[in-house]
Amino acid sequence: MTSLMPGAGLLPIPTPNPLTTLGVSLSSLGAIPAAALDPNIATLGEIPQPPLMGNVDPSKIDEIRRTVYVGNLNSQTTTADQLLEFFKQVGEVKFVRMAGDETQPTRFAFVEFADQNSVPRALAFNGVMFGDRPLKINHSNNAIVKPPEMTPQAAAKELEEVMKRVREAQSFISAAIEPESGKSNERKGGRSRSHTRSKSRSSSKSHSRRKRSQSKHRSRSHNRSRSRQKDRRRSKSPHKKRSKSRERRKSRSRSHSRDKRKDTREKIKEKERVKEKDREKEREREKEREKEKERGKNKDRDKEREKDREKDKEKDREREREKEHEKDRDKEKEKEQDKEKEREKDRSKEIDEKRKKDKKSRTPPRSYNASRRSRSSSRERRRRRSRSSSRSPRTSKTIKRKSSRSPSPRSRNKKDKKREKERDHISERRERERSTSMRKSSNDRDGKEKLEKNSTSLKEKEHNKEPDSSVSKEVDDKDAPRTEENKIQHNGNCQLNEENLSTKTEAV
């Protein structure tokens, strides 16, 4: 049986051993009911299984269905081996796991069967006495936590480590055996004790034996030296000399072999130390590399963060610049609007001044007023004469038609006014068109247009003055014959009245 760690109790299925190895008989543990051992009982399938939790791994559902909870166990007497042997009678057991605190009087366990059909049989043991307590058996809601299975990579690493250890041991053994094999050929007859020492592979035993052999060798050499002295005193024979030389050779070979063993062991130990140091250095280098990599990653992250910050700052600066440009544009637009307003005001002032000048130029001269007064006086005379003519006989119509055909100054004045209005409208339209073109054109063209406007205004003023002067001359010329006609009419009227009287008399 495999030994169990205290408090753990994860137990695989061992080779079947007799129950006497546990020291507890099944009769003392508890009586198994006959119904549980009978596989043909229909009532066993009717035991309902509890519903599983929602967060259960679907790969472990089969394991949970095959596990059983066993409670009310005596923590001092019951072991996993006893539970395994007890539940083997029901079916094939895969794992047994002891759980709970060992210091408490009661513990519980989980038993996983190989087949799900053995679970209802195990549930039939509920209430059976196990030792001095009745068992509490029920379905399990959890699967047994098993040790992680070895991956092929981990297994390969373990094999490599084991093979390295085996090779080191083989090299150590071969180094220890090689000098002993050479000595055994020289020593024939089993005189050397190093051969027996080489068979013992433990370092402690070999070390102790070496100490003993050294002490024995010293005592023997001391005794031999004494015996040699005695022999020299007694007799010096060639046979004794040969034995002494052989012994010397043997002692030298033994010491030489021991020195070689020590040297080989020391070399092996030094090699192992060097290897361990190299491994430690490699580990330290790997750690330093990892640290450098982490530092490099951190530096890269810091650089990226700084770049992002710089980009954000540049974006903010660009936004501020755009805002400033927009403000400057708005200011320029406002300035342009103010300039346009001032220009419009100047234009309106110029137009008003032009109109005032035109009105002043349109006012008739004194000669025109005098002619008007003469006309009004002539009209009054006509009215008086017409009144008198109503009393007197009517005059001929031919003379009146002649007088009406002469152009009157009122009609001429109206035509002049219409022409002036048309000219004003044309000039205003031109000014509006020029104002629109002035807005589109640049500031350089504004000065040129102002000069053109001034020149056109002067020309218009001169043009307006010329027709006014011509109109006044025409009025004066027309007034002079009118006065002559009036004079003629005065004389003619008298004649007409006489003729009218003659015609009336004839009619009567």
Swiss-Prot record:
It comes from the Eukaryota. Its main location: nucleus. One of its GO terms (biological process) is mRNA processing. SUPFAM superfamilies: RNA-binding domain, RBD (SSF54928). Residues 66-142 form the RRM domain. Belongs to the splicing factor SR family. Residues 489-508 have a biased composition (Polar residues). One of its GO terms (cellular component) is nuclear speck. The keyword Nucleus applies. Residues 180-189, 260-355, 419-488 have a biased composition (Basic and acidic residues). Participates in the regulation of alternative splicing by modulating the activity of other splice facors. Inhibits the splicing activity of SFRS1, SFRS2 and SFRS6. Augments the splicing activity of SFRS3. Disulfide bonds: none annotated. InterPro entries: Nucleotide-bd_a/b_plait_sf, RBD_domain_sf, RRM_dom, SREK1_RRM2. This is Splicing regulatory glutamine/lysine-rich protein 1. Keywords: Isopeptide bond, mRNA processing, mRNA splicing, Nucleus, Phosphoprotein, Spliceosome, Ubl conjugation. Homodimer. Binds SFRS1, SFRS2, SFRS3 and SFRS6. Interacts with the spliceosome. Interacts with SREK1IP1. The modification Phosphoserine is found at residues 171, 184. The modification Phosphothreonine is found at residue 363. It comes from Homo sapiens (Human).
